[in-house]
Each structure stands twice: as structure tokens, then as C-alpha cells.
Amino acid sequence: MAKEKFNRTKPHVNIGTIGHVDHGKTTLSAAISAVLSLKGLAEMKDYDNIDNAPEEKERGITIATSHIEYETENRHYAHVDCPGHADYVKNMITGAAQMDGAILVVSAADGPMPQTREHILLSRQVGVPHIVVFLNKQDMVDDQELLELVEMEVRELLSAYEFPGDDTPIVAGSALRALEEAKAGNVGEWGEKVLKLMAEVDAYIPTPERDTEKTFLMPVEDVFSIAGRGTVVTGRIERGVVKVGDEVEIVGIRATQKTTVTGVEMFRKELEKGEAGDNVGVLLRGTKKEEVERGMVLCKPGSITPHKKFEGEIYVLSKEEGGRHTPFFTNYRPQFYVRTTDVTGSITLPEGVEMVMPGDNVKITVELISPVALELGTKFAIREGGRTVGAGVVSNIIE
């Protein structure tokens, strides 16, 4: 048992393990919790406990994910681990478990494998900002030169996907050996390597900006007219803070408009300010009810712009998940549900990709019929006749 209760005053960071199947992601997750539990900073979670991940539904997509939590001297971490490759793909694309950074696990005995590459690419596409590497199974490699060769390969692979390969911290060790030591009740030479890894994670992955510190953005859910007071726009504040007197822009669907906030209320009570996570009504000066509609966003002026054409990384639901039963081709025209509204758009598949089958993940180019407030990392659902057939994230804005 942990000796003390979790201390919530430490900065909180979300991380996860990524990498090829059987390279030791789950063993490492168990080893981290085991080694830190000896320091009273975590509760020991067994491998089986993590590997039998409960299935969760995120926008109708079934994802198996394990969540563990632990602390280092400096931080509190929430850590996600997925049992299967498909679960990782779905997790990263839907943002079910947002990651501020990732630990890439590569077997020193095998070197980078296809899913190593795919997880690095996905991290780049979906905006996982920082990666630290653990070269696992070091106990199976007698040749120091081989270890250095694998390290070089990993650095080159990271650089190929625009991560700073040369500056990425890489720690070698053995998750299994560290776990065995910790179960015997001590932090030995292998446990020290896990602590070294966590020290690198502490130092290299920055503490994320809190949602309230970001620029203000609120998707519009509904619009009302209040006699004598003007137009009220309601929604849940996605990020930032809004207060009376703030200038805001209304972006999306039509030409961008500027206005001033004259009131912020929650449950009919006046608030000094609304902040990320609050469901509020925002009163706008001189704005007519018919000028605002669901699907637009209120935001800090200049912080987000409307776009029609973008590239996205998508996961297409399988038939079992309630998705399509048949593939789709270029020029497929579904609805793209962004934040609070559906907008029709047409899909262009990459060169050399004839069609996309249910259960696949692919990069697509989308052209919407009307502009929507978009930025890198904006999540969307793909819908057809009201049912979700895919999920995606904006990876590049074209126009």
C-alpha cells in the first residue's frame, strides 16, 4: 500500500506508453508503478491488472484502455496503457486519453518495428508534443554496439517525423527485471533505470498549460433573445476565461463578427467570469439573434479562423462498432460533426489508396461546404444519416 495519500498540490501531467506490440509497454507501466510504490509514491499495479483493460466507449468507438496513476517527487501523473494496437490508434485519434507526452517503448533486442513507426507518425499527426524513449529488454542484448545501433535507428525515426531525434532522452533498461526486483521489495540496478526514465520524463515533458490559461473559446450550442437585454449565446467553455467587457469574435459558417461581452451568467446568476468547463450564457452587445447559430464559436479575437479545406487523420468504425458495412471511396460526402454542428464535406483519399474499409485508419483531405473554426488538433466525428461512422483529428489546414 502507498504510505501516504496522493498529494494534489503537485502539477498534473497526462502521459502514456506507446510502441510496437510485445516490446514491453504494459510491463513498463507495471514496473513504473511498482518501483514508485517502494518510494510511497504509487500503488503497485500488477501486469494482469493493467493488461485486462476495461473497454470504454468514446463516441461509440470501443476502446480498451488502462489508467494508472502515480507520482514522482515533482509531479502527479495519469498514465494510459492500451492492450492492442487498434486501441492505440483509436485512442490517439479520438483523444479519449489526451497525452501531454509519451514514453515510446522499443525492444533493444528487436529495434524499431512497423507499429513503432506508426505510433510516432500518429503522435505527430494528433499532436502528442513530446516523446521520451525507453529501450527495453537491455538484459537480452550482450553487445553494446547493437544497443547503440538501435538507439541511432530510433533517433533517425523520430527525426523523420519531425521530432527532435538528436535531443530526445533515451534510457535503456529492463522493465521485467525492474518489476521482479520491486516485487522482491527492493529498487536494484534495474529499478534505478526506471527511476532514471521517470527523471527524464519529469525534466523533458513540460507541464501543460492549464485549460483556463489558454485563449478563450466557446462553441455555440444555443442562441436566445432576451427582451431589453439583447442576445444570449449558451455553451460550455472549451478553454480560457471570459468576463464582462471582453471583446470576442463570432467565427464559423458566415463572415467573422466582432462584439463585446455585456454579461456572463450561469444558472441565471451573474458571474464575474466564466472559465474552461463552465456551462454559461454569454450576453453580446448589439448582436442580433439571427446573426449567430449553433456551430459557430465565440473566441478571443484573432485566435482561431474559419476554414473549409483540411487534412485529417481518421479512424473508420468497424461494422461491429455500428459503423459502415461497406468501404468508401474518394468523393464520399458525409457530414463532419465539429464541436456542436454537422457540416457536409467531401473526402479525397491519398494517392495510391483506392478505398477505405470499416476498421481502417487513414489520412484524408476534406473540403467542407461552409467554413468552420478549425485548428490543428480539432477533433471531429464523421456521420452519415445521424450515426457516427468515423472519428478524426485535424492534422493540417490547407485553406
UniProtKB/Swiss-Prot annotation:
Q: What residue stretches are annotated with the tr-type G domain?
A: 10-209
Region feature (G3): 81-84
- Report the EC code(s) recorded for this entry: 3.6.5.3
What is a single molecular function from GO for this protein? translation elongation factor activity
Q: Where is this region: G4?
A: 136-139
Q: Name one GO cellular component term.
A: cytosol
Q: Which UniProt keywords apply?
A: Cytoplasm, Elongation factor, GTP-binding, Hydrolase, Magnesium, Metal-binding, Nucleotide-binding, Protein biosynthesis
Lineage, top-rank taxon, reads Bacteria
Keyword Iron applies: no
Which amino acid positions bind GTP, per UniProt? Answer: 19-26, 81-85, 136-139
Q: Identify the residues that bind Mg(2+).
A: 26
Keyword Zinc-finger assigned: no
Q: Give its localization.
A: Cytoplasm
Q: Which InterPro entries match?
A: EF-Tu_GTP-bd (IPR041709), EF-Tu_GTPase (IPR050055), EFTu-like_2 (IPR004161), EFTU_2 (IPR033720), G_TR_CS (IPR031157), P-loop_NTPase (IPR027417), Small_GTP-bd (IPR005225), T_Tr_GTP-bd_dom (IPR000795)
Q: What reaction is this protein's catalytic activity? A: GTP + H2O = GDP + phosphate + H(+)
* Segments of this protein annotated with the region G2: 60-64
Q: Where is this region: G1?
A: 19-26
Segments for region (G5): 174-176
Which PROSITE patterns has this protein been placed in? G_TR_1 (PS00301), G_TR_2 (PS51722)
Q: What does this protein do?
A: GTP hydrolase that promotes the GTP-dependent binding of aminoacyl-tRNA to the A-site of ribosomes during protein biosynthesis.
Which family would the database say this protein is a member of?
Belongs to the TRAFAC class translation factor GTPase superfamily. Classic translation factor GTPase family. EF-Tu/EF-1A subfamily.
Question: How does this chain assemble?
Answer: Monomer.
Q: What is this protein called?
A: Elongation factor Tu
What organism does the record attribute this protein to?
Answer: Helicobacter pylori (strain Shi470)
